[in-house]
Amino acid sequence: AAERNITIVPEIDVPGHSAAAIVSYPELKLSARPLPEIPVSFNDGAAFDPTSERTYQFIGDVMTELASLFPGGIIHIGGDEVRYKKYWEGVPHIEAFMKKKGIKTFPDLGRLDGKAIIHFWYGSDKIATKAIEDGHQVVNSTSHMTYINKDEQKLPLSKSYSFEPVFPGLKPRYHDQVLGLGCQVWTEWI
């Protein structure tokens, strides 16, 4: 990969998309919630307990191991598609944790560090352009062009190959902040 200027970026999507980990390590789940089944769909409806030190120890251990396996220096942590209302809203110890940390609403959890690289996969190009203008670097993986597990009739491979990751209308001075593109594949759909 390095010879072809490709950085392989592993993704461990947390705190959502965590059913397999929670089934394997039940101590990571919210105590009041039943164990999820291991699904074969994009949205598993499970989330770690954000108040548990065991959660952070587990995630830290996984990230440390990934960092030793992938030399690119970047790990994608996802952070999307968490069903906050279903799993965290109304849970007293989570609400107490949020209050203690000064987190007023669940969307406040989505604030980004200024150094965060944004992996743009869905929504208006204006969102990504604004993030770039605010100083973020972006990987453009807009789903209608880069999700290579889609039916060949809907997204021919030739269309993915021809995709230009620089957003239309992005001022040239920002082009270097577009790091490239990512192509996604979900093997359960192949």
Protein language model features and the residues they cover:
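Substrate-binding cleft of carbohydrate-active enzyme catalytic domains
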Residues: A1-T105
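Substrate-binding groove of N-acetylhexosamine-processing glycoside hydrolases
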Residues: S52-H76, E81, K99-I190
